[in-house]
Protein backbone atom coordinates (compact mmCIF):
# COMPACT_ATOMS: atom_id res chain seq x y z
CA UNK A 1 0.00 0.00 0.00
CA UNK A 2 1.37 3.47 -0.89
CA UNK A 3 2.76 5.46 2.05
CA UNK A 4 2.23 9.24 2.15
CA UNK A 5 4.88 10.89 4.32
CA UNK A 6 4.94 14.57 5.28
CA UNK A 7 6.09 16.51 8.38
CA UNK A 8 2.64 15.89 9.85
CA UNK A 9 2.21 12.14 9.43
CA UNK A 10 3.08 8.94 7.62
CA UNK A 11 -0.10 7.37 6.27
CA UNK A 12 -1.38 4.44 4.26
CA UNK A 13 -4.01 5.81 1.87
CA UNK A 14 -6.39 4.22 -0.64
CA UNK A 15 -8.47 5.64 -3.47
CA UNK A 16 -12.23 5.12 -3.76
CA UNK A 17 -13.43 3.01 -5.39
CA UNK A 18 -10.51 0.79 -4.50
CA UNK A 19 -9.33 -1.46 -7.31
CA UNK A 20 -7.13 -4.53 -6.89
CA UNK A 21 -3.62 -3.78 -8.13
CA UNK A 22 -4.53 -0.07 -8.21
CA UNK A 23 -1.88 1.72 -10.32
CA UNK A 24 -2.84 5.18 -9.05
CA UNK A 25 -2.14 6.72 -5.65
CA UNK A 26 -4.58 8.51 -3.34
CA UNK A 27 -2.19 11.49 -3.14
CA UNK A 28 0.25 13.40 -5.32
CA UNK A 29 3.08 15.93 -5.14
CA UNK A 30 0.62 18.83 -4.90
CA UNK A 31 -0.72 17.41 -1.61
CA UNK A 32 2.84 17.06 -0.36
CA UNK A 33 3.74 20.61 -1.43
CA UNK A 34 0.69 22.06 0.36
CA UNK A 35 1.49 20.29 3.61
CA UNK A 36 5.18 21.17 3.50
CA UNK A 37 4.25 24.82 2.99
CA UNK A 38 1.78 24.70 5.88
CA UNK A 39 4.42 23.17 8.15
CA UNK A 40 6.99 25.81 7.18
CA UNK A 41 4.52 28.62 7.86
CA UNK A 42 3.51 27.20 11.24
CA UNK A 43 0.14 25.64 12.05
CA UNK A 44 -1.31 26.36 15.49
CA UNK A 45 -3.59 23.98 17.37
CA UNK A 46 -6.17 26.75 17.73
CA UNK A 47 -6.28 27.45 13.97
CA UNK A 48 -9.46 26.76 12.03
CA UNK A 49 -8.60 25.21 8.67
CA UNK A 50 -10.79 24.56 5.64
CA UNK A 51 -9.89 22.02 2.97
CA UNK A 52 -11.54 22.18 -0.44
CA UNK A 53 -11.51 19.25 -2.90
CA UNK A 54 -9.26 16.93 -0.88
CA UNK A 55 -9.87 14.03 -3.26
CA UNK A 56 -9.29 10.98 -1.06
CA UNK A 57 -8.52 12.53 2.32
CA UNK A 58 -4.72 12.83 2.09
CA UNK A 59 -4.76 16.37 3.49
CA UNK A 60 -7.47 15.80 6.09
CA UNK A 61 -5.89 12.61 7.43
CA UNK A 62 -2.50 14.33 7.66
CA UNK A 63 -3.96 17.21 9.68
CA UNK A 64 -6.51 15.30 11.78
CA UNK A 65 -6.13 16.22 15.44
CA UNK A 66 -3.60 19.01 14.78
CA UNK A 67 -6.15 21.83 14.46
CA UNK A 68 -9.85 22.35 13.73
CA UNK A 69 -10.29 20.75 10.29
CA UNK A 70 -13.31 21.12 7.99
CA UNK A 71 -13.19 19.33 4.65
CA UNK A 72 -15.62 20.23 1.85
CA UNK A 73 -15.92 18.30 -1.39
CA UNK A 74 -18.44 17.56 -4.14
CA UNK A 75 -17.61 13.85 -4.14
CA UNK A 76 -19.45 11.24 -2.09
CA UNK A 77 -16.76 8.75 -3.12
CA UNK A 78 -14.25 11.21 -1.69
CA UNK A 79 -16.20 11.25 1.57
CA UNK A 80 -16.14 7.43 1.71
CA UNK A 81 -12.38 7.49 1.03
CA UNK A 82 -11.88 10.01 3.84
CA UNK A 83 -13.78 7.86 6.32
CA UNK A 84 -11.96 4.69 5.23
CA UNK A 85 -8.54 6.34 5.37
CA UNK A 86 -9.18 7.86 8.79
CA UNK A 87 -10.22 4.45 10.10
CA UNK A 88 -7.39 2.65 8.31
CA UNK A 89 -4.83 4.88 10.00
CA UNK A 90 -6.38 4.70 13.46
CA UNK A 91 -7.51 8.33 13.39
CA UNK A 92 -10.56 9.72 15.15
CA UNK A 93 -13.45 10.23 12.72
CA UNK A 94 -14.56 13.27 14.71
CA UNK A 95 -11.20 14.98 14.11
CA UNK A 96 -12.43 16.07 10.66
CA UNK A 97 -15.78 17.69 9.94
CA UNK A 98 -16.96 16.82 6.44
CA UNK A 99 -19.23 19.22 4.58
CA UNK A 100 -20.82 18.42 1.19
CA UNK A 101 -20.33 21.08 -1.46
CA UNK A 102 -24.06 21.80 -1.45
CA UNK A 103 -23.55 23.51 1.94
CA UNK A 104 -21.60 26.71 2.63
CA UNK A 105 -18.65 26.36 5.05
CA UNK A 106 -19.04 28.51 8.15
CA UNK A 107 -15.88 30.27 9.33
CA UNK A 108 -14.01 32.22 10.32
CA UNK A 109 -11.12 30.21 8.87
CA UNK A 110 -7.44 30.96 9.47
CA UNK A 111 -6.32 28.71 6.62
CA UNK A 112 -7.99 27.62 3.39
CA UNK A 113 -6.15 24.91 1.43
CA UNK A 114 -7.58 24.24 -2.02
CA UNK A 115 -6.92 21.46 -4.50
CA UNK A 116 -7.81 23.06 -7.83
CA UNK A 117 -10.68 21.01 -9.29
CA UNK A 118 -11.07 19.98 -12.92
CA UNK A 119 -14.23 22.08 -13.22
CA UNK A 120 -13.33 25.73 -12.68
CA UNK A 121 -17.00 26.60 -12.14
CA UNK A 122 -16.80 24.57 -8.93
CA UNK A 123 -13.72 26.54 -7.85
CA UNK A 124 -15.50 29.81 -8.63
CA UNK A 125 -18.55 28.85 -6.57
CA UNK A 126 -16.34 27.76 -3.68
CA UNK A 127 -14.41 31.04 -3.73
CA UNK A 128 -17.65 33.03 -3.83
CA UNK A 129 -18.85 31.17 -0.74
CA UNK A 130 -15.67 32.11 1.13
CA UNK A 131 -16.81 35.74 1.23
CA UNK A 132 -17.21 36.73 4.87
CA UNK A 133 -15.79 33.42 6.12
CA UNK A 134 -12.09 34.35 6.46
CA UNK A 135 -10.49 35.36 9.75
CA UNK A 136 -8.26 38.46 9.89
CA UNK A 137 -4.87 37.50 8.49
CA UNK A 138 -6.24 34.32 6.88
CA UNK A 139 -4.14 32.59 4.27
CA UNK A 140 -5.57 30.98 1.14
CA UNK A 141 -3.37 28.54 -0.77
CA UNK A 142 -4.35 26.55 -3.85
CA UNK A 143 -2.36 23.66 -5.30
CA UNK A 144 -2.32 21.51 -8.40
CA UNK A 145 -0.02 19.55 -10.61
CA UNK A 146 1.33 21.98 -13.21
CA UNK A 147 -0.27 20.09 -16.11
CA UNK A 148 -3.69 20.50 -14.45
CA UNK A 149 -3.31 24.16 -13.42
CA UNK A 150 -4.91 26.59 -15.89
CA UNK A 151 -4.14 30.30 -15.76
CA UNK A 152 -7.85 30.90 -15.12
CA UNK A 153 -7.52 29.35 -11.65
CA UNK A 154 -5.20 32.16 -10.58
CA UNK A 155 -7.53 34.70 -12.19
CA UNK A 156 -10.44 33.41 -10.10
CA UNK A 157 -8.40 33.56 -6.90
CA UNK A 158 -7.42 37.14 -7.65
CA UNK A 159 -11.01 38.11 -8.53
CA UNK A 160 -12.62 36.71 -5.38
CA UNK A 161 -9.80 36.62 -2.77
CA UNK A 162 -6.98 39.02 -3.62
CA UNK A 163 -3.49 39.28 -5.16
CA UNK A 164 -1.94 35.95 -6.12
CA UNK A 165 1.68 34.84 -6.10
CA UNK A 166 2.64 31.63 -7.88
CA UNK A 167 5.32 29.46 -6.28
CA UNK A 168 8.16 27.73 -8.02
CA UNK A 169 7.28 24.28 -9.31
CA UNK A 170 8.35 21.39 -7.08
CA UNK A 171 8.01 17.82 -8.34
CA UNK A 172 5.81 19.23 -11.14
CA UNK A 173 3.40 20.77 -8.60
CA UNK A 174 2.74 24.45 -7.97
CA UNK A 175 1.10 26.57 -5.28
CA UNK A 176 -0.96 29.73 -5.75
CA UNK A 177 -0.80 31.94 -2.64
CA UNK A 178 -3.64 34.45 -2.41
CA UNK A 179 -3.63 37.42 -0.02
CA UNK A 180 -7.21 38.20 1.06
CA UNK A 181 -8.37 41.76 0.66
CA UNK A 182 -11.70 43.50 1.28
CA UNK A 183 -14.12 42.96 -1.59
CA UNK A 184 -17.80 43.62 -2.21
CA UNK A 185 -20.09 40.65 -1.75
CA UNK A 186 -19.95 38.74 -5.06
CA UNK A 187 -22.94 37.54 -7.06
CA UNK A 188 -22.88 33.86 -7.98
CA UNK A 189 -23.67 32.93 -11.60
CA UNK A 190 -24.77 29.49 -10.40
CA UNK A 191 -26.94 27.57 -10.82
CA UNK A 192 -27.33 27.92 -14.58
CA UNK A 193 -30.68 27.33 -16.29
CA UNK A 194 -31.80 26.04 -19.68
CA UNK A 195 -34.94 24.74 -21.38
CA UNK A 196 -35.75 21.47 -23.14
CA UNK A 197 -38.47 21.11 -25.75
CA UNK A 198 -38.97 17.34 -25.53
CA UNK A 199 -39.90 16.77 -22.80
CA UNK A 200 -40.85 20.36 -22.00
CA UNK A 201 -38.67 21.12 -18.99
CA UNK A 202 -36.78 24.00 -17.46
CA UNK A 203 -33.67 22.59 -15.81
CA UNK A 204 -31.01 23.95 -13.47
CA UNK A 205 -27.43 22.84 -13.04
CA UNK A 206 -25.35 23.70 -10.00
CA UNK A 207 -21.71 24.56 -10.57
CA UNK A 208 -20.12 21.09 -10.75
CA UNK A 209 -22.77 19.33 -12.86
CA UNK A 210 -21.43 17.79 -16.06
CA UNK A 211 -22.23 19.87 -19.17
CA UNK A 212 -23.36 22.75 -16.99
CA UNK A 213 -24.74 25.07 -19.69
CA UNK A 214 -27.04 22.64 -21.49
CA UNK A 215 -28.00 19.04 -22.12
CA UNK A 216 -25.00 16.82 -22.80
CA UNK A 217 -25.01 15.15 -26.21
CA UNK A 218 -25.11 11.63 -24.79
CA UNK A 219 -28.30 12.30 -22.86
CA UNK A 220 -29.70 14.09 -25.91
CA UNK A 221 -29.13 10.91 -27.92
CA UNK A 222 -30.72 8.77 -25.17
CA UNK A 223 -33.93 10.71 -24.43
CA UNK A 224 -35.89 9.82 -27.61
CA UNK A 225 -35.28 6.12 -26.94
CA UNK A 226 -36.21 5.77 -23.27
CA UNK A 227 -38.03 2.45 -22.76
CA UNK A 228 -41.81 2.72 -22.68
CA UNK A 229 -42.94 -0.86 -23.29
CA UNK A 230 -41.88 -2.18 -19.90
CA UNK A 231 -44.12 -2.58 -16.89
CA UNK A 232 -41.26 -1.21 -14.83
CA UNK A 233 -42.43 0.09 -11.47
CA UNK A 234 -39.07 0.31 -9.68
CA UNK A 235 -36.68 2.39 -11.74
CA UNK A 236 -33.25 3.92 -11.03
CA UNK A 237 -31.42 6.73 -12.80
CA UNK A 238 -27.84 5.71 -12.03
CA UNK A 239 -25.34 8.58 -12.16
CA UNK A 240 -28.32 10.89 -12.53
CA UNK A 241 -26.56 14.24 -12.97
CA UNK A 242 -29.30 16.86 -12.93
CA UNK A 243 -31.94 14.11 -13.05
CA UNK A 244 -33.20 14.63 -16.58
CA UNK A 245 -33.36 10.92 -17.54
CA UNK A 246 -35.25 9.93 -14.40
CA UNK A 247 -37.57 12.93 -14.66
CA UNK A 248 -38.32 12.25 -18.34
CA UNK A 249 -39.09 8.60 -17.57
CA UNK A 250 -41.29 9.56 -14.61
CA UNK A 251 -43.31 12.01 -16.71
CA UNK A 252 -44.25 9.17 -19.07
CA UNK A 253 -44.76 6.54 -16.34
CA UNK A 254 -47.01 7.91 -13.58
CA UNK A 255 -46.92 4.68 -11.55
CA UNK A 256 -43.14 4.25 -11.54
CA UNK A 257 -41.19 4.62 -8.31
CA UNK A 258 -37.94 6.44 -9.10
CA UNK A 259 -34.55 6.38 -7.42
CA UNK A 260 -32.02 8.95 -8.63
CA UNK A 261 -28.46 8.58 -7.37
CA UNK A 262 -25.17 10.34 -8.09
CA UNK A 263 -21.84 10.68 -6.31
CA UNK A 264 -21.82 14.47 -6.85
CA UNK A 265 -23.60 16.45 -4.16
CA UNK A 266 -24.24 19.31 -6.58
CA UNK A 267 -25.76 16.87 -9.08
CA UNK A 268 -28.08 15.54 -6.39
CA UNK A 269 -29.02 19.07 -5.34
CA UNK A 270 -29.79 19.89 -8.99
CA UNK A 271 -31.83 16.70 -9.43
CA UNK A 272 -33.92 17.40 -6.34
CA UNK A 273 -34.74 20.93 -7.47
CA UNK A 274 -35.49 19.80 -11.03
CA UNK A 275 -37.72 16.96 -9.81
CA UNK A 276 -39.70 19.33 -7.60
CA UNK A 277 -40.13 21.80 -10.47
CA UNK A 278 -41.30 19.11 -12.92
CA UNK A 279 -43.19 16.70 -10.67
CA UNK A 280 -44.10 18.66 -7.57
CA UNK A 281 -44.56 16.50 -4.49
CA UNK A 282 -44.51 13.15 -6.29
CA UNK A 283 -42.38 10.87 -4.09
CA UNK A 284 -38.91 9.85 -5.24
CA UNK A 285 -35.64 8.80 -3.66
CA UNK A 286 -32.90 11.23 -4.70
CA UNK A 287 -29.61 10.73 -2.90
CA UNK A 288 -25.85 10.95 -3.00
CA UNK A 289 -24.31 7.51 -3.02
CA UNK A 290 -21.75 5.06 -4.31
CA UNK A 291 -23.90 4.14 -7.27
CA UNK A 292 -26.26 1.29 -6.40
CA UNK A 293 -23.96 -0.18 -3.74
CA UNK A 294 -26.65 0.39 -1.10
CA UNK A 295 -29.53 -0.87 -3.28
CA UNK A 296 -30.94 -4.26 -2.16
CA UNK A 297 -30.39 -7.13 -4.58
CA UNK A 298 -33.29 -7.76 -6.93
CA UNK A 299 -35.08 -4.55 -5.98
CA UNK A 300 -35.22 -2.81 -9.38
CA UNK A 301 -37.00 -3.52 -12.66
CA UNK A 302 -35.14 -0.99 -14.79
CA UNK A 303 -31.90 1.00 -14.57
CA UNK A 304 -31.15 3.98 -16.82
CA UNK A 305 -27.53 5.09 -17.05
CA UNK A 306 -25.32 7.56 -18.91
CA UNK A 307 -22.06 6.38 -17.31
CA UNK A 308 -19.08 8.68 -16.70
CA UNK A 309 -15.72 7.88 -18.28
CA UNK A 310 -13.52 9.94 -15.96
CA UNK A 311 -12.88 10.48 -12.26
CA UNK A 312 -11.39 13.95 -11.85
CA UNK A 313 -8.48 13.95 -14.33
CA UNK A 314 -8.32 10.15 -14.64
CA UNK A 315 -9.99 8.76 -17.77
CA UNK A 316 -11.12 5.13 -18.01
CA UNK A 317 -14.06 2.75 -17.98
CA UNK A 318 -13.56 1.47 -14.43
CA UNK A 319 -16.44 3.55 -13.06
CA UNK A 320 -18.79 2.42 -15.84
CA UNK A 321 -17.84 -1.24 -15.31
CA UNK A 322 -18.54 -0.90 -11.62
CA UNK A 323 -21.92 0.70 -12.31
CA UNK A 324 -22.83 -2.12 -14.69
CA UNK A 325 -21.99 -4.66 -11.98
CA UNK A 326 -24.06 -2.75 -9.43
CA UNK A 327 -27.00 -2.55 -11.83
CA UNK A 328 -26.91 -6.29 -12.49
CA UNK A 329 -26.97 -7.03 -8.76
CA UNK A 330 -29.86 -4.63 -8.12
CA UNK A 331 -32.07 -5.83 -11.00
CA UNK A 332 -34.65 -8.59 -10.77
CA UNK A 333 -34.29 -11.53 -13.12
CA UNK A 334 -35.67 -10.24 -16.41
CA UNK A 335 -34.90 -6.64 -15.46
CA UNK A 336 -33.12 -4.35 -17.89
CA UNK A 337 -30.23 -1.89 -17.89
CA UNK A 338 -30.44 0.77 -20.60
CA UNK A 339 -27.34 2.87 -21.26
CA UNK A 340 -25.93 5.39 -23.68
CA UNK A 341 -22.23 5.47 -24.43
CA UNK A 342 -19.62 6.59 -26.93
CA UNK A 343 -19.23 4.01 -29.69
CA UNK A 344 -15.48 3.68 -29.20
CA UNK A 345 -15.82 2.59 -25.54
CA UNK A 346 -17.07 -0.87 -26.53
CA UNK A 347 -19.73 -1.15 -23.83
CA UNK A 348 -21.59 -3.86 -25.80
CA UNK A 349 -18.82 -6.38 -25.17
CA UNK A 350 -18.52 -5.41 -21.51
CA UNK A 351 -22.25 -5.74 -20.89
CA UNK A 352 -22.27 -9.13 -22.63
CA UNK A 353 -19.94 -10.43 -19.90
CA UNK A 354 -22.54 -9.60 -17.24
CA UNK A 355 -25.98 -9.91 -18.83
CA UNK A 356 -27.99 -12.64 -20.55
CA UNK A 357 -28.60 -10.54 -23.63
CA UNK A 358 -27.46 -7.20 -25.05
CA UNK A 359 -29.18 -5.36 -27.89
CA UNK A 360 -28.47 -2.12 -29.72
CA UNK A 361 -31.57 0.06 -29.52
CA UNK A 362 -30.32 3.10 -31.44
CA UNK A 363 -27.13 4.61 -32.78
CA UNK A 364 -25.67 7.71 -34.37
CA UNK A 365 -22.11 8.34 -35.54
CA UNK A 366 -20.92 9.03 -31.99
CA UNK A 367 -23.24 7.22 -29.54
CA UNK A 368 -25.05 3.93 -29.08
CA UNK A 369 -28.06 3.17 -26.89
CA UNK A 370 -27.88 -0.37 -25.51
CA UNK A 371 -30.33 -2.60 -23.65
CA UNK A 372 -28.94 -5.34 -21.40
CA UNK A 373 -31.33 -7.97 -20.00
CA UNK A 374 -30.60 -9.91 -16.83
Curated annotation (Swiss-Prot):
Compartments where found: Cytoplasm
Molecular function GO labels: 23S rRNA (guanine(1835)-N(2))-methyltransferase activity; nucleic acid binding
The family assignment reads: Belongs to the methyltransferase superfamily. RlmG family.
Listed SUPFAM superfamilies: S-adenosyl-L-methionine-dependent methyltransferases
Q: Does the keyword Transferase apply?
A: yes
What EC number(s) is this enzyme filed under?
A: 2.1.1.174
Tell me what reaction this enzyme catalyses.
guanosine(1835) in 23S rRNA + S-adenosyl-L-methionine = N(2)-methylguanosine(1835) in 23S rRNA + S-adenosyl-L-homocysteine + H(+)
Chief localization: cytoplasm
Going by the record, the broad EC class of this enzyme is: transferase
Q: A Gene Ontology CC term for this entry? A: cytoplasm
Q: What does this protein do?
A: Specifically methylates the guanine in position 1835 (m2G1835) of 23S rRNA.
- What organism, scientifically named, is this protein from? Ectopseudomonas mendocina (strain ymp)
State a single Pfam family of this protein.
MTS
Q: What is this protein called?
A: Ribosomal RNA large subunit methyltransferase G
Amino acid sequence: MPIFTTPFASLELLRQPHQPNEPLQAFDAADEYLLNHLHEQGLRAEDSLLLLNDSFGALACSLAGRCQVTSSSDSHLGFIALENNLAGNGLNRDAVRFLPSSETPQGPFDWVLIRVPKTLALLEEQLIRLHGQLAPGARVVAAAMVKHLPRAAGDLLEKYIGPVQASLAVKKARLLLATPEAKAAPHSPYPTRYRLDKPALELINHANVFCRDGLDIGTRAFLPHLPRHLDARRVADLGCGNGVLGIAYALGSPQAQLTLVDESYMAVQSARENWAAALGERPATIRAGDGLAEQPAGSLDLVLCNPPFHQQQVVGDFLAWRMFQQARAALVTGGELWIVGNRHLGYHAKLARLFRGVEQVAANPKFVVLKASK
